[in-house]
């Protein structure tokens, strides 16, 4: 399996990557993360040799397309999200950009690559 895992430097995404690498070392994992306030790339240090890390935005359709095509991705697991409700009240823009526009961008790319599956992960913190 060739996975593109977005938001993998966040708490939940990083735990998914750590567990997946441990249980499926034969799989290819490409990580795409914007490294915003909720991310910590060091969460992925234990598996840094087993993954490809790309800093970038899920709303960048050209980047997502390139990663899917260059790495023969067959599954996108989307953990990317802005969370922390208090922050969204003071400025909703980054939340709309990532949680809505970013997710839409991934879906648009996948529509052009129908063999790619999407697993969308969310938490109560994005609402």
Sequence positions of predicted segments:
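N-terminal Rossmann-like NAD(P)+-binding domain of SDR-like oxidoreductases, especially those catalyzing
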Residues: 1-127
